[in-house]
Amino acid sequence: QDRFLYQLTDFSALEKAHHEQKILENPLLTSRLVQQRFKGVNPHAQAMGHKPAKHAYNFFLGSDSSRWASGVGAYGEVGYQDYYPGIDMFWKNDQANYKYLFVVAPGSAPAQIMWDYTGADAVIHKKGSLLLKTAIGEIREEQPFAYQEINGKQIMVACAYTEVSEGVYGYSFGAYDLAYPLVIDP
C-alpha cells in the first residue's frame, strides 16, 4: 500500500532478431525493478473505488475455496482515503497509462507527501521533471501539475519536485488558498 513498482525491460535483443529475421531459441531479456516508496503513509488508510465498471471478476486461487472470491468489483478509479492525514490518493487509467494524484483537504499539509526510490538514481531536471536513471533506461515524471477548484474555476497552483533530504523527494508549492482542496497531479 505504500509503494509503486516499475519494471523496465530491455527488448533490444528481440528487436534486433526481428530486424535480422532470426529466431532466438532462448532470448535473454534484461530487466530492472524501480520501487517508489511513500514515507509515513497511514497503514490503516481505507481503500475506495469510484466509477464502477459494469462487469465483475472471479478469482480462484488453488483448490481451497476459502481463498476464492467472486463478484469482485472493477473500478475506473481507486484510491485510499486518508493515505496521509487529510490527504487522499487516487489511481486512474488515463488512455492506457496509469496516473495517480493526491487530493489535499483544506488546511492539511501537502508537505507530508514524501517518497524515495530503490533501483534508480533520481535527478530533478532543470525543466522541472524528475528523471529516474537505471542501467537499461529512464523513467521521466513530468513536472507536477497542481490546482484548486474555486467557484467552478480551475485555479493553477505553482508546483515543483523538491529533494526534501538526500534521496527523499516531495513537492513545493506557490501560494494557494488553504480554505479549498488542493489537487496534485504528478
Question: Where would I find each of the regions flagged by the language model?
Answer:
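Residues that cap or anchor secondary-structure elements
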Residues: Q1-P186
